[in-house]
Amino acid sequence: VRIHIIKMTIHLVKIAVGIESIDHLRDLQLERICRAKEEGVHDKLIHLTRNTPRRRNEVLQNGSIYWIIKGYIRVRQHIIGMEKVVGRNGQQLCALVLDPLLKKTILLPHKPIQGWRYKEEEAVPNDLNEDEIKSSLPSSMAEELRSLGLL
């Protein structure tokens, strides 16, 4: 008898500290990619963390990082790799290699957290489709309506 262990995809959820909007996140990430290219360091979009996720293999099975912006999960990015790097002070870090494409999600309120949290597939919000993106309310209005229980 053979037993097959199927590893499920796990996602990361993290606060985008200091980020005001999805556009702000996009601009900052683009700036970082350009700066790294100019300095000849690399041409990838990376996000540095102190620790490598223990569930690395599950995250790398099509996992994403879901960004909390202003109290809501609003957007995600596919994690395409993880690399060990050395920081400026010689500290070992983990570079999450991200797909630059930001995919808007259904707004999902989330409490503040430190670091990241793992989330199963069922616990993360669905992506918005093109029609939903085009017809969606401005995020500030949608937030207000949600807080009032009207959405």
Regions flagged by a language model, labelled:
Residues I33-R76:
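Short, well-structured hydrophobic secondary-structure segments
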Residues H11, Q61, Q92-C94:
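A generic structural signal for short beta-strands and their flanking turns/coil linkers
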Residues E20, Q61, S140:
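Short, well-structured alpha-helical interface segments that form or flank functional binding sites
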Residues R2-Q29:
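Short, extreme N-terminal leader segments that mark the start of a protein/domain
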Residues Q77-P125:
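Aromatic- and Lys/Arg-enriched surface recognition patch
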Residues Q114-L151:
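Well-ordered alpha/beta subsegment
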Residues L30-E31, E83:
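Short, solvent-exposed amphipathic alpha-helical segments in soluble enzyme
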Residues R2, E38-G40, E130-I133:
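Intrinsically disordered, low-complexity linkers and terminal tails enriched in Pro/Gly
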